[in-house]
């Protein structure tokens, strides 16, 4: 089945929010994984991490996580966020974007979204940023990228990281 054969909207089903696409060439690999005895970490995960690291990272190893929330939590820790810090995050996002902040005791300042893209509003970020802001979190909603050029300018000016939630 090709992507063109999977309509995102139909008269019978309405708008399909999550329509998994698994190419037929992946079926045998999936069967091997699912029929294997490894539930979590295992040989296929090791292979994936190595291939991903080689393709997307120069000097760093990549770590596969069980969920996007786990990956974001790790990213927030690696960004140096700690109890009492303040971050700016979009008001419209999956709860997974912000749940780790609750574990960590990080204060969230919610930025409005641009109604045409549903991504974080640059103007809202500019209004919310203070000397207490330790990071900006953005979510690329529905596969539509945020205005990273503008966010990078703000982050650079304030010497803070941007953490992108692309899940």
Task: Locate each region found by the language model.
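N-terminal "arm"/small-domain region of PLP-dependent enzymes with the aminotransferase-like
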Residues: 1-39
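Glycine-/small-residue-rich active-site loops that bind phosphorylated ligands and cofactors
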Residues: 22, 40, 93, 116-117, ...
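Generic structural signal for small/hydrophobic residues in well-ordered secondary structure
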Residues: 29-30, 52, 71, 87, ...
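Phosphate-binding glycine-rich loop
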Residues: 38-86, 100-104, 110-112
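Short N-terminal helix/helix-N-cap motif within the alpha/beta-hydrolase-1
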Residues: 73, 91-92, 146-147
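Histidine-centered beta-alpha loop that forms part of the nucleotide-sugar donor binding/catalytic region
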Residues: 92, 106, 113, 167
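Conserved coil-to-alpha-helix start sites within the AMP-binding
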Residues: 92-98
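Active-site phosphate-binding strand-loop segment of PLP-dependent enzymes
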Residues: 116-167
């Amino acid at each position: 089945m090709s992507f063109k054969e999977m309509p995102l909207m139909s008269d019978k089903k309405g708008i399909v929010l999550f329509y998994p696409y698994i190419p037929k060439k992946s079926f045998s690999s999936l069967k091997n994984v699912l029929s294997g005895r490894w539930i979590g970490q295992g040989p296929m995960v090791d292979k994936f991490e190595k291939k991903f690291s080689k393709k997307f990272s120069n000097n760093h190893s990549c770590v596969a996580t069980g969920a996007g929330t786990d990956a974001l939590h790790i990213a927030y820790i690696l960004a140096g966020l700690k109890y009492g810090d303040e971050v700016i995050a979009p008001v419209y996002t999956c709860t997974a974007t912000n749940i780790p902040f609750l574990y960590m005791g990080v204060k969230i300042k919610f930025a409005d979204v641009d109604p045409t893209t549903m991504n974080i509003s640059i103007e809202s970020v500019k209004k919310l940023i203070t000397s207490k802001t330790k990071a900006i979190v953005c979510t690329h909603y529905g596969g539509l990228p945020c205005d990273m050029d503008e966010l990078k300018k703000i982050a650079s000016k304030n010497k803070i990281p941007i953490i992108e939630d692309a899940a």
